[in-house]
Protein backbone atom coordinates (compact mmCIF):
# COMPACT_ATOMS: atom_id res chain seq x y z
CA UNK A 1 0.00 0.00 0.00
CA UNK A 2 1.59 3.34 -1.04
CA UNK A 3 2.60 5.76 1.70
CA UNK A 4 1.23 9.31 1.50
CA UNK A 5 3.73 11.85 0.19
CA UNK A 6 4.39 15.09 2.06
CA UNK A 7 5.46 18.33 0.35
CA UNK A 8 8.18 20.56 1.86
CA UNK A 9 6.69 22.95 4.41
CA UNK A 10 3.96 20.47 5.41
CA UNK A 11 3.48 20.21 9.16
CA UNK A 12 2.82 16.69 10.43
CA UNK A 13 2.40 14.84 13.71
CA UNK A 14 4.36 11.72 14.62
CA UNK A 15 2.42 8.48 15.10
CA UNK A 16 5.03 6.69 17.20
CA UNK A 17 8.25 7.19 19.14
CA UNK A 18 11.90 7.08 18.10
CA UNK A 19 13.82 7.47 21.37
CA UNK A 20 17.00 5.81 20.07
CA UNK A 21 17.62 7.36 16.66
CA UNK A 22 20.40 6.09 14.43
CA UNK A 23 22.99 8.62 13.21
CA UNK A 24 21.25 11.21 11.03
CA UNK A 25 17.78 10.28 12.25
CA UNK A 26 15.46 12.54 14.22
CA UNK A 27 14.48 11.74 17.81
CA UNK A 28 10.79 12.19 18.55
CA UNK A 29 7.92 11.09 20.76
CA UNK A 30 4.41 10.15 19.74
CA UNK A 31 2.36 13.26 18.99
CA UNK A 32 5.32 15.58 18.32
CA UNK A 33 5.07 18.20 15.58
CA UNK A 34 7.57 18.31 12.71
CA UNK A 35 7.91 20.33 9.50
CA UNK A 36 8.92 18.49 6.33
CA UNK A 37 12.06 20.02 4.79
CA UNK A 38 12.54 17.69 1.81
CA UNK A 39 11.80 14.22 0.55
CA UNK A 40 14.42 11.53 0.11
CA UNK A 41 14.50 9.54 -3.10
CA UNK A 42 14.11 6.02 -1.71
CA UNK A 43 12.15 4.20 0.98
CA UNK A 44 9.79 7.09 1.72
CA UNK A 45 12.04 8.87 4.17
CA UNK A 46 12.06 12.60 4.83
CA UNK A 47 14.31 15.22 6.33
CA UNK A 48 12.29 17.20 8.85
CA UNK A 49 12.65 19.78 11.61
CA UNK A 50 11.35 19.06 15.11
CA UNK A 51 9.19 21.89 16.50
CA UNK A 52 10.24 21.58 20.14
CA UNK A 53 13.93 20.74 19.88
CA UNK A 54 14.61 22.63 16.64
CA UNK A 55 16.74 19.68 15.50
CA UNK A 56 16.77 18.41 11.92
CA UNK A 57 17.03 14.79 10.86
CA UNK A 58 15.55 11.90 8.93
CA UNK A 59 12.36 10.02 9.71
CA UNK A 60 10.17 7.52 7.89
CA UNK A 61 6.96 8.58 6.17
CA UNK A 62 5.22 5.71 7.96
CA UNK A 63 5.86 7.53 11.25
CA UNK A 64 3.87 10.59 10.12
CA UNK A 65 0.23 11.50 10.01
CA UNK A 66 -1.67 14.53 8.83
CA UNK A 67 -2.96 16.99 11.41
CA UNK A 68 -6.63 16.61 12.29
CA UNK A 69 -9.25 19.16 11.28
CA UNK A 70 -10.67 20.98 14.28
CA UNK A 71 -14.20 20.20 15.37
CA UNK A 72 -16.42 23.29 15.43
CA UNK A 73 -19.24 21.72 17.44
CA UNK A 74 -19.23 22.62 20.26
CA UNK A 75 -17.56 25.92 19.45
CA UNK A 76 -13.99 26.32 20.67
CA UNK A 77 -13.47 29.03 23.27
CA UNK A 78 -10.35 31.15 23.66
CA UNK A 79 -11.61 32.01 27.15
CA UNK A 80 -13.16 28.88 28.70
CA UNK A 81 -12.70 30.56 32.11
CA UNK A 82 -15.05 33.45 31.14
CA UNK A 83 -18.47 32.89 32.73
CA UNK A 84 -20.27 35.99 31.46
CA UNK A 85 -22.99 37.53 33.60
CA UNK A 86 -22.95 35.72 36.92
CA UNK A 87 -23.11 37.23 40.41
CA UNK A 88 -20.31 37.28 42.95
CA UNK A 89 -22.14 34.64 44.99
CA UNK A 90 -22.46 32.38 41.94
CA UNK A 91 -18.73 32.82 41.31
CA UNK A 92 -17.98 31.70 44.87
CA UNK A 93 -20.12 28.59 44.33
CA UNK A 94 -18.31 27.83 41.08
CA UNK A 95 -14.92 28.03 42.82
CA UNK A 96 -15.70 25.26 45.32
CA UNK A 97 -14.06 23.31 46.85
CA UNK A 98 -11.37 25.92 47.68
CA UNK A 99 -8.10 25.51 45.79
CA UNK A 100 -5.36 28.14 45.67
CA UNK A 101 -5.14 29.66 42.18
CA UNK A 102 -8.48 28.34 40.93
CA UNK A 103 -10.05 31.25 39.03
CA UNK A 104 -12.71 32.55 36.68
CA UNK A 105 -13.59 35.88 35.05
CA UNK A 106 -17.12 37.30 35.02
CA UNK A 107 -18.91 40.46 33.96
CA UNK A 108 -19.42 42.97 36.76
CA UNK A 109 -23.03 43.24 37.96
CA UNK A 110 -22.39 46.51 39.83
CA UNK A 111 -20.31 48.19 37.11
CA UNK A 112 -21.69 47.28 33.65
CA UNK A 113 -18.93 46.99 31.06
CA UNK A 114 -16.26 46.11 33.61
CA UNK A 115 -15.04 42.61 34.46
CA UNK A 116 -14.17 40.84 37.71
CA UNK A 117 -11.33 38.36 38.21
CA UNK A 118 -12.36 35.87 40.93
CA UNK A 119 -9.54 33.90 42.57
CA UNK A 120 -9.70 31.15 45.20
CA UNK A 121 -7.09 31.63 47.95
CA UNK A 122 -7.09 29.89 51.32
CA UNK A 123 -10.74 29.55 52.28
CA UNK A 124 -11.79 32.76 50.51
CA UNK A 125 -12.62 33.91 46.99
CA UNK A 126 -11.06 37.29 46.21
CA UNK A 127 -12.85 39.50 43.66
CA UNK A 128 -10.66 41.92 41.64
CA UNK A 129 -12.44 44.56 39.57
CA UNK A 130 -10.91 44.90 36.10
CA UNK A 131 -11.00 48.55 35.00
CA UNK A 132 -11.00 50.12 31.54
CA UNK A 133 -8.25 52.72 31.14
CA UNK A 134 -7.42 54.36 27.78
CA UNK A 135 -8.51 51.35 25.77
CA UNK A 136 -6.71 48.87 28.03
CA UNK A 137 -7.63 46.71 31.02
CA UNK A 138 -6.03 46.94 34.45
CA UNK A 139 -6.52 45.76 38.03
CA UNK A 140 -3.99 47.98 39.85
CA UNK A 141 -3.49 50.78 37.25
CA UNK A 142 0.20 49.85 37.20
CA UNK A 143 0.07 47.00 34.67
CA UNK A 144 -2.24 47.31 31.64
CA UNK A 145 -3.42 44.64 29.21
CA UNK A 146 -4.79 44.56 25.67
CA UNK A 147 -7.50 42.06 26.56
CA UNK A 148 -8.63 39.47 29.11
CA UNK A 149 -6.52 36.71 27.55
CA UNK A 150 -3.42 38.89 27.94
CA UNK A 151 -4.35 39.58 31.58
CA UNK A 152 -4.87 35.91 32.46
CA UNK A 153 -1.63 34.94 30.72
CA UNK A 154 0.27 37.57 32.75
CA UNK A 155 -1.12 36.54 36.15
CA UNK A 156 -0.49 32.89 35.33
CA UNK A 157 3.23 33.76 35.21
CA UNK A 158 3.40 36.50 37.86
CA UNK A 159 1.06 37.11 40.81
CA UNK A 160 1.84 40.84 40.81
CA UNK A 161 -0.87 42.74 42.69
CA UNK A 162 -3.19 39.76 43.23
CA UNK A 163 -3.19 37.19 46.04
CA UNK A 164 -1.63 34.28 44.11
CA UNK A 165 -0.70 33.19 40.62
CA UNK A 166 -3.57 31.92 38.50
CA UNK A 167 -3.11 28.16 38.48
CA UNK A 168 -6.26 26.43 37.31
CA UNK A 169 -9.13 27.88 35.25
CA UNK A 170 -12.67 27.02 36.29
CA UNK A 171 -14.15 26.15 32.92
CA UNK A 172 -17.65 27.34 32.11
CA UNK A 173 -19.99 24.39 31.64
CA UNK A 174 -20.06 23.36 27.98
CA UNK A 175 -16.99 25.43 27.03
CA UNK A 176 -14.35 23.66 24.99
CA UNK A 177 -10.80 24.96 25.49
CA UNK A 178 -9.33 26.19 22.22
CA UNK A 179 -5.79 25.77 23.57
CA UNK A 180 -6.34 22.10 24.44
CA UNK A 181 -8.08 21.25 21.17
CA UNK A 182 -5.54 23.11 19.01
CA UNK A 183 -2.69 21.27 20.74
CA UNK A 184 -4.39 17.88 20.46
CA UNK A 185 -5.07 18.32 16.74
CA UNK A 186 -1.57 19.67 16.02
CA UNK A 187 -2.46 23.28 15.15
CA UNK A 188 -1.07 25.03 18.25
CA UNK A 189 2.34 26.50 17.44
CA UNK A 190 5.05 27.55 19.90
CA UNK A 191 5.67 31.28 20.32
CA UNK A 192 9.39 30.76 21.02
CA UNK A 193 9.91 29.51 17.45
CA UNK A 194 8.25 32.58 15.87
CA UNK A 195 10.30 35.60 14.78
CA UNK A 196 8.31 38.63 13.64
CA UNK A 197 9.54 41.04 10.99
CA UNK A 198 8.22 43.98 8.99
CA UNK A 199 4.56 44.75 8.44
CA UNK A 200 3.45 43.61 4.97
CA UNK A 201 -0.24 44.44 5.17
CA UNK A 202 -2.99 46.06 7.20
CA UNK A 203 -6.40 44.45 7.52
CA UNK A 204 -9.56 45.74 9.13
CA UNK A 205 -8.89 43.64 12.23
CA UNK A 206 -5.12 43.92 12.62
CA UNK A 207 -1.70 44.12 11.01
CA UNK A 208 -0.18 41.38 8.86
CA UNK A 209 3.51 40.82 9.57
CA UNK A 210 6.22 38.90 7.79
CA UNK A 211 7.96 36.38 9.99
CA UNK A 212 9.79 33.10 10.31
CA UNK A 213 8.66 29.95 12.05
CA UNK A 214 11.39 27.34 12.48
CA UNK A 215 13.23 28.90 9.54
CA UNK A 216 10.18 28.90 7.24
CA UNK A 217 8.92 32.25 5.94
CA UNK A 218 5.40 32.95 7.16
CA UNK A 219 2.77 35.69 7.21
CA UNK A 220 1.29 36.41 10.64
CA UNK A 221 -1.98 38.12 11.48
CA UNK A 222 -2.28 39.33 15.08
CA UNK A 223 -5.80 39.96 16.46
CA UNK A 224 -5.87 41.48 19.94
CA UNK A 225 -9.56 42.20 20.56
CA UNK A 226 -11.19 39.34 22.51
CA UNK A 227 -14.39 39.29 20.47
CA UNK A 228 -12.64 39.58 17.10
CA UNK A 229 -10.08 36.94 18.08
CA UNK A 230 -12.89 34.54 18.96
CA UNK A 231 -14.57 35.20 15.59
CA UNK A 232 -11.30 34.59 13.75
CA UNK A 233 -10.75 31.39 15.72
CA UNK A 234 -14.10 30.14 14.42
CA UNK A 235 -12.97 30.84 10.85
CA UNK A 236 -9.56 29.26 11.55
CA UNK A 237 -11.29 26.07 12.66
CA UNK A 238 -12.96 25.98 9.24
CA UNK A 239 -9.61 26.55 7.52
CA UNK A 240 -8.14 23.42 9.15
CA UNK A 241 -10.55 21.43 6.95
CA UNK A 242 -9.38 23.11 3.71
CA UNK A 243 -6.48 22.05 1.52
CA UNK A 244 -6.06 23.30 -2.04
CA UNK A 245 -3.16 24.66 -4.09
CA UNK A 246 -5.13 27.85 -4.82
CA UNK A 247 -5.96 28.68 -1.19
CA UNK A 248 -3.41 30.28 1.12
CA UNK A 249 -2.41 27.56 3.57
CA UNK A 250 -2.94 27.83 7.33
CA UNK A 251 0.15 26.69 9.25
CA UNK A 252 -1.19 27.07 12.76
CA UNK A 253 -2.20 29.32 15.63
CA UNK A 254 -0.37 30.88 18.59
CA UNK A 255 -2.31 32.05 21.65
CA UNK A 256 -0.39 35.06 22.99
CA UNK A 257 -1.57 38.68 23.37
CA UNK A 258 -4.75 37.59 21.65
CA UNK A 259 -4.47 35.38 18.60
CA UNK A 260 -1.67 34.93 16.07
CA UNK A 261 -2.80 33.25 12.86
CA UNK A 262 0.25 31.87 11.04
CA UNK A 263 -0.11 31.40 7.27
CA UNK A 264 2.20 30.41 4.45
CA UNK A 265 4.15 33.39 3.07
CA UNK A 266 3.21 34.12 -0.54
CA UNK A 267 6.20 36.03 -1.86
CA UNK A 268 4.94 38.24 -4.70
CA UNK A 269 2.19 39.96 -2.75
CA UNK A 270 -1.37 40.71 -3.77
CA UNK A 271 -2.60 40.47 -7.34
CA UNK A 272 -3.59 44.15 -7.64
CA UNK A 273 -0.08 45.40 -6.87
CA UNK A 274 1.50 42.62 -8.95
CA UNK A 275 -0.44 43.74 -12.04
CA UNK A 276 -0.10 47.49 -11.46
CA UNK A 277 3.68 47.33 -11.05
CA UNK A 278 4.24 45.19 -14.16
CA UNK A 279 1.53 46.09 -16.65
CA UNK A 280 0.96 44.86 -20.20
CA UNK A 281 4.65 44.88 -21.10
CA UNK A 282 5.46 42.14 -18.59
CA UNK A 283 2.20 40.23 -18.05
CA UNK A 284 0.67 38.47 -21.07
CA UNK A 285 -3.01 37.75 -21.70
CA UNK A 286 -2.32 34.05 -21.18
CA UNK A 287 -0.84 34.83 -17.74
CA UNK A 288 -3.96 36.85 -16.87
CA UNK A 289 -6.10 33.87 -17.89
CA UNK A 290 -3.99 31.58 -15.71
CA UNK A 291 -4.45 33.86 -12.70
CA UNK A 292 -8.21 33.96 -13.31
CA UNK A 293 -8.32 30.17 -13.63
CA UNK A 294 -6.34 29.70 -10.41
CA UNK A 295 -8.81 31.88 -8.51
CA UNK A 296 -11.80 30.09 -10.06
CA UNK A 297 -10.35 26.70 -9.06
CA UNK A 298 -9.85 27.86 -5.47
CA UNK A 299 -13.40 29.20 -5.41
CA UNK A 300 -14.78 26.00 -6.96
CA UNK A 301 -13.22 24.13 -4.04
CA UNK A 302 -14.80 26.50 -1.50
CA UNK A 303 -18.12 26.16 -3.31
CA UNK A 304 -17.88 22.37 -3.03
CA UNK A 305 -17.43 22.79 0.75
CA UNK A 306 -20.50 25.08 0.86
CA UNK A 307 -18.38 28.00 2.03
CA UNK A 308 -18.83 31.59 0.90
CA UNK A 309 -15.86 33.97 0.86
CA UNK A 310 -17.84 37.25 0.89
CA UNK A 311 -14.81 39.47 0.19
CA UNK A 312 -13.48 38.11 -3.10
CA UNK A 313 -11.38 40.79 -4.82
CA UNK A 314 -7.95 41.00 -6.45
CA UNK A 315 -6.53 42.59 -3.28
CA UNK A 316 -7.31 39.31 -1.50
CA UNK A 317 -5.51 37.15 -4.06
CA UNK A 318 -1.82 36.48 -3.41
CA UNK A 319 0.77 35.47 -6.01
CA UNK A 320 3.47 32.91 -5.22
CA UNK A 321 7.06 32.81 -6.45
CA UNK A 322 6.06 30.36 -9.21
CA UNK A 323 3.08 32.57 -10.25
CA UNK A 324 0.31 30.55 -8.64
CA UNK A 325 -2.61 32.73 -7.55
CA UNK A 326 -4.02 31.84 -4.12
CA UNK A 327 -7.26 33.01 -2.51
CA UNK A 328 -6.63 34.58 0.89
CA UNK A 329 -8.35 36.51 3.68
CA UNK A 330 -11.11 34.32 4.99
CA UNK A 331 -11.96 36.89 7.69
CA UNK A 332 -15.49 37.21 6.30
CA UNK A 333 -15.90 33.62 5.11
CA UNK A 334 -19.01 31.89 6.40
CA UNK A 335 -21.15 28.88 5.75
CA UNK A 336 -23.48 29.36 2.81
CA UNK A 337 -26.52 31.66 2.95
CA UNK A 338 -25.59 33.39 6.18
CA UNK A 339 -27.10 36.81 6.88
CA UNK A 340 -26.48 39.72 9.19
CA UNK A 341 -23.13 41.28 8.22
CA UNK A 342 -23.02 45.03 8.89
CA UNK A 343 -23.69 46.55 5.46
CA UNK A 344 -21.52 49.59 6.24
CA UNK A 345 -18.45 47.33 6.15
CA UNK A 346 -19.21 45.71 2.80
CA UNK A 347 -16.92 46.28 -0.20
CA UNK A 348 -19.70 47.84 -2.29
CA UNK A 349 -18.00 47.69 -5.70
CA UNK A 350 -17.46 43.93 -5.38
CA UNK A 351 -20.67 42.92 -3.58
CA UNK A 352 -23.69 41.43 -5.36
CA UNK A 353 -26.93 43.48 -5.33
CA UNK A 354 -28.87 40.90 -3.27
CA UNK A 355 -26.10 40.90 -0.65
CA UNK A 356 -26.04 44.71 -0.47
CA UNK A 357 -29.81 44.97 -0.30
CA UNK A 358 -30.83 41.98 1.81
CA UNK A 359 -27.58 40.70 3.34
CA UNK A 360 -28.04 37.44 1.42
CA UNK A 361 -24.68 35.83 0.64
CA UNK A 362 -24.17 32.60 -1.28
CA UNK A 363 -21.75 31.09 -3.78
CA UNK A 364 -23.70 33.04 -6.39
CA UNK A 365 -22.80 36.34 -4.70
CA UNK A 366 -19.16 35.18 -4.79
CA UNK A 367 -19.61 34.60 -8.54
CA UNK A 368 -20.70 38.24 -8.92
CA UNK A 369 -17.55 39.33 -7.06
CA UNK A 370 -15.48 37.06 -9.31
CA UNK A 371 -16.83 38.97 -12.33
CA UNK A 372 -15.51 42.21 -10.80
CA UNK A 373 -12.19 40.48 -10.07
CA UNK A 374 -11.99 39.45 -13.74
CA UNK A 375 -12.43 43.11 -14.69
CA UNK A 376 -9.61 44.06 -12.28
CA UNK A 377 -7.32 41.41 -13.72
CA UNK A 378 -7.85 42.32 -17.38
CA UNK A 379 -7.53 46.04 -16.63
CA UNK A 380 -4.14 45.31 -15.01
CA UNK A 381 -5.23 46.29 -11.53
CA UNK A 382 -7.43 49.34 -12.12
CA UNK A 383 -10.08 50.14 -9.52
CA UNK A 384 -13.51 48.99 -10.77
CA UNK A 385 -16.26 51.49 -11.60
CA UNK A 386 -13.73 54.30 -12.16
CA UNK A 387 -14.80 57.83 -11.18
CA UNK A 388 -18.02 56.56 -9.54
CA UNK A 389 -18.84 56.95 -5.84
CA UNK A 390 -20.06 53.96 -3.83
CA UNK A 391 -23.58 55.41 -3.78
CA UNK A 392 -23.51 55.91 -7.56
CA UNK A 393 -22.28 52.34 -8.08
CA UNK A 394 -25.00 50.70 -5.97
CA UNK A 395 -27.75 52.80 -7.58
CA UNK A 396 -26.47 52.27 -11.14
CA UNK A 397 -26.03 48.51 -10.73
CA UNK A 398 -29.54 48.22 -9.28
CA UNK A 399 -30.83 49.93 -12.47
CA UNK A 400 -28.94 47.48 -14.71
CA UNK A 401 -25.63 49.25 -15.36
CA UNK A 402 -22.65 46.97 -16.05
CA UNK A 403 -19.03 47.97 -16.68
CA UNK A 404 -17.61 48.05 -20.19
CA UNK A 405 -14.76 45.58 -20.83
CA UNK A 406 -11.18 46.76 -20.23
CA UNK A 407 -9.03 47.53 -23.28
CA UNK A 408 -7.90 44.39 -25.16
CA UNK A 409 -10.05 42.12 -22.99
CA UNK A 410 -10.82 38.88 -24.91
CA UNK A 411 -14.46 38.67 -26.01
CA UNK A 412 -15.16 35.36 -24.20
CA UNK A 413 -13.83 36.85 -20.95
CA UNK A 414 -16.17 39.85 -21.27
CA UNK A 415 -19.05 37.47 -21.97
CA UNK A 416 -18.12 35.55 -18.81
CA UNK A 417 -18.11 38.80 -16.80
CA UNK A 418 -21.62 39.51 -18.05
CA UNK A 419 -22.87 36.09 -16.98
CA UNK A 420 -21.34 36.63 -13.51
CA UNK A 421 -23.28 39.91 -13.29
CA UNK A 422 -26.73 38.50 -13.99
CA UNK A 423 -29.25 40.26 -11.74
CA UNK A 424 -30.93 36.95 -10.89
CA UNK A 425 -28.44 34.89 -8.81
CA UNK A 426 -29.69 31.55 -10.17
CA UNK A 427 -28.71 32.62 -13.70
CA UNK A 428 -25.05 33.08 -12.75
CA UNK A 429 -22.78 30.12 -13.56
CA UNK A 430 -21.35 27.92 -10.79
CA UNK A 431 -17.58 28.08 -10.36
CA UNK A 432 -17.32 24.61 -11.92
CA UNK A 433 -18.59 26.07 -15.22
CA UNK A 434 -16.35 29.12 -14.87
CA UNK A 435 -13.32 26.83 -14.53
CA UNK A 436 -14.35 24.98 -17.70
CA UNK A 437 -14.80 28.21 -19.68
CA UNK A 438 -11.49 29.72 -18.58
CA UNK A 439 -9.72 26.43 -19.30
CA UNK A 440 -11.10 26.44 -22.86
CA UNK A 441 -10.06 30.05 -23.38
CA UNK A 442 -6.56 29.32 -22.08
CA UNK A 443 -6.22 26.39 -24.48
CA UNK A 444 -7.42 28.58 -27.35
CA UNK A 445 -4.39 30.86 -26.87
CA UNK A 446 -2.09 27.84 -26.94
CA UNK A 447 -1.50 27.26 -23.22
CA UNK A 448 -2.39 24.00 -21.50
CA UNK A 449 -4.61 24.62 -18.48
CA UNK A 450 -2.87 23.40 -15.29
CA UNK A 451 -4.39 20.47 -13.45
CA UNK A 452 -6.32 21.93 -10.54
CA UNK A 453 -7.92 20.37 -7.54
CA UNK A 454 -7.14 19.47 -4.00
CA UNK A 455 -3.50 19.74 -3.19
CA UNK A 456 -1.67 16.44 -3.28
CA UNK A 457 0.85 16.35 -0.48
CA UNK A 458 3.00 14.27 -2.75
CA UNK A 459 4.22 16.91 -5.16
CA UNK A 460 7.47 17.14 -3.28
CA UNK A 461 10.77 17.49 -5.12
CA UNK A 462 13.10 14.65 -4.25
CA UNK A 463 16.82 14.29 -3.80
CA UNK A 464 18.99 11.28 -3.34
CA UNK A 465 19.40 10.90 0.40
CA UNK A 466 18.74 7.65 2.16
CA UNK A 467 19.22 6.79 5.82
Curated annotation (Swiss-Prot):
Residues 7-69 form the SH3 domain. Its EC number is 2.7.10.2. Coiled coil: none annotated. It comes from the Eukaryota. Residues 81-170 form the SH2 domain. It is found in: Cytoplasm; Membrane. Keywords: ATP-binding, Cytoplasm, Kinase, Membrane, Nucleotide-binding, SH2 domain, SH3 domain, Transferase, Tyrosine-protein kinase. PROSITE patterns: PROTEIN_KINASE_ATP, PROTEIN_KINASE_DOM, PROTEIN_KINASE_TYR, SH2, SH3. One of its GO terms (molecular function) is non-membrane spanning protein tyrosine kinase activity. ATP binds at residues 200-208, 221. It catalyses: L-tyrosyl-[protein] + ATP = O-phospho-L-tyrosyl-[protein] + ADP + H(+). Enriched in lymphoid tissues. Residues 194-443 form the Protein kinase domain. It is an enzyme of class 2 (transferase). One of its GO terms (cellular component) is plasma membrane. The active site is at residue 311. Residues 1-20, 445-467 are annotated as: Disordered. PANTHER family: TYROSINE-PROTEIN KINASE (PTHR24418). Interacts with KIT. Belongs to the protein kinase superfamily. Tyr protein kinase family. CSK subfamily. Could play a significant role in the signal transduction of hematopoietic cells. May regulate tyrosine kinase activity of SRC-family members in brain. This is Megakaryocyte-associated tyrosine-protein kinase. It comes from Rattus norvegicus. The gene is Matk.
